[in-house]
């Protein structure tokens, strides 16, 4: 299913031996084996917190639009006793406007989250938000499922439906029949044709989802305001979230951007997964920039090399994204090859960050 479990729990801090060897080999000629505890304690990561809270505030704003529109949509459906054919006949223009506005809000909410995902998903004490908002599966995959169930206004409980971006996107864009209205064609613009990207959501499910989304966004923001990032948090986020390229590229390969009508991913339809990957890496580059002086305390050469490789990985993905947005079509085979290259680079970077943390005496947290 689209936008469901990414298997991040399986991304261990124990990296392949070849990666560790690479990290050891690239540490430069620094003869000191002493840790720089004082440097790590003195690190000021206020900028990381500001980056996080700026993005949580943006997410709140965009999700508030989704919720407000969802409430209006629910009221319209309720006014016709959830007769969706009648809803479109009597209120079609309003529905079309609300859903179009909601899609715009969704497209803005997505990067607001993805750019901070490296921190949210990479810091264990924040990572449950990533499961519920962006990465968790539905009840069919209990190990990776979201923690919440949706209590619908009609009294029905929708047990662990999948993460909130997944539910919202697939309802708005009509790719998951489970979340769509019954008894009417999925023809939002009233032109007599059901076209890709048109979805008339089940109002009970949709309003429950955007209410939960609003609550989760508010809660994440509250915890972000209390969050005081440490070097351990930053190093951990980089080691957990950088070597996840292969699973992201797999989702891209299975999405409509490559597979077309044969896509097995229900999500990733509003924008390409490549855009998400670039956004995630952008946040990781920002995070590394804030700890690079610590790495340089032990080895300026290593600090520079890691920065170059991480920014190079971002540039690599941005180039793929830009080519795709300009009309270039990739094949599934190319996606596999490109993903393998991205993963190779990412594992090397994570190995270097792991080695730097060890030399600095900075603890890496368990995912």
Describe every region a protein language model picked out:
Residues 22-26:
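C-terminal motif of bacterial Sec signal peptides marking the signal peptidase cleavage site
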Residues 16-20:
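Classical Sec-dependent N-terminal signal peptides that target proteins to the secretory pathway
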Residues 28-31:
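Bacterial signal peptide processing site
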């Amino acid at each position: 299913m689209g936008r469901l479990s990414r298997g991040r729990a399986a991304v261990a801090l124990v990296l392949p031996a070849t990666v560790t060897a690479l990290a050891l080999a690239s540490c430069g000629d620094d003869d000191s084996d002493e840790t720089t505890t004082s440097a790590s304690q003195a690190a000021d990561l206020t900028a990381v917190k500001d980056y996080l809270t700026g993005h949580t505030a943006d997410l709140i704003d965009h999700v508030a639009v989704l919720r407000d529109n969802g409430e209006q949509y629910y009221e319209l459906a309720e006014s016709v006793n959830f007769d969706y054919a009648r809803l479109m006949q009597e209120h079609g223009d309003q529905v079309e406007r609300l859903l179009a506005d909601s899609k715009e809000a969704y497209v803005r909410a997505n990067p607001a989250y993805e750019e901070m995902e490296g921190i949210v998903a990479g810091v264990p004490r924040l990572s449950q938000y990533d499961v519920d908002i962006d990465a968790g599966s539905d009840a069919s995959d209990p190990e990776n499922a979201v923690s919440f169930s949706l209590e619908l206004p009609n009294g029905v409980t929708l047990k662990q439906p999948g993460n909130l971006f997944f539910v919202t996107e697939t309802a708005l864009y009509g790719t998951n029949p489970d979340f769509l209205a019954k008894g009417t064609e999925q023809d939002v613009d009233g032109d007599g044709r059901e076209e890709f990207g048109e979805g008339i959501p089940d109002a009970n499910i949709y309003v429950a989802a955007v209410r939960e989304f609003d609550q989760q966004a508010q809660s994440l923001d509250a915890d972000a305001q209390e969050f005081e990032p440490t070097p351990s948090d930053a190093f951990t986020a980089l080691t957990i979230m950088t070597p996840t390229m292969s699973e992201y590229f797999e989702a891209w390969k299975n999405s409509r951007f490559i597979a077309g009508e044969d896509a097995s991913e229900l999500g990733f339809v509003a924008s390409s997964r490549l855009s998400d990957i670039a956004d995630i890496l952008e946040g990781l580059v920002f995070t590394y920039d804030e700890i690079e002086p610590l790495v340089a305390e032990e080895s300026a050469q290593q600090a520079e090399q890691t920065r170059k490789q991480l920014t190079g990985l971002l540039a690599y993905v941005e180039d793929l994204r830009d080519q795709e947005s300009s009309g270039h079509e990739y094949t599934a085979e190319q996606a596999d090859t490109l993903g393998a290259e991205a993963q190779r680079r990412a594992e090397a970077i994570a190995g270097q960050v792991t080695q730097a943390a060890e030399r600095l005496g900075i603890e890496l947290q368990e995912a």
